[in-house]
C-alpha cells in the first residue's frame, strides 16, 4: 500500500479540500493481488480503485468512449513484420490510467491508510482505476504525447501511429 500511495502522491493525483455543498464523494477500496515475477518470486501489490459505479452521468462524467486498435490493423502489421523480417517489440505502460488528467470535478473519500485531515476529501486531478472516464483520459494523454514527439495518427485507425526516418520507420499500435 505504501508504494501505491507514494506513486499517487508523486503523480499529484489529488488535493485535499472540503467537499462543496451539493457534491458527493465517491467511495474507494484497496484491491490486493499477488503477482508472480518471471524469476518465480512473489510480489504483493495493492491498487487503489474508485467505485466508479457510483458516478452519475452528466455530473461525474459525460463521455467514456475510447478507441481500441482494430484487429485488421494488428493482422496487417504482423503480416508486414513476418513478410519483411522486421523487429517487433511489445511494451507495457505501468499505471497507464493514472496519467490521464481529469476535466470533471470529482471528489473521493480519503483512502484507508491515508493520513490527512478527516474532515476533508480528495479532489481528483488525475484518473484512478475504476473511474468511467479513465480509459478515455489515458488515450487523450497518450495521443497528445505521440503527436508531440512527431508520430502521425493513422486516419483509418486512431490507435495506430507511424513515424518515418531516413532509413527506417516505427509503427506503434495502442492496445488496451
Where are these predicted regions, by residue range?
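Long, low-complexity, charge-biased intrinsically disordered regions
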Residues: 1-176
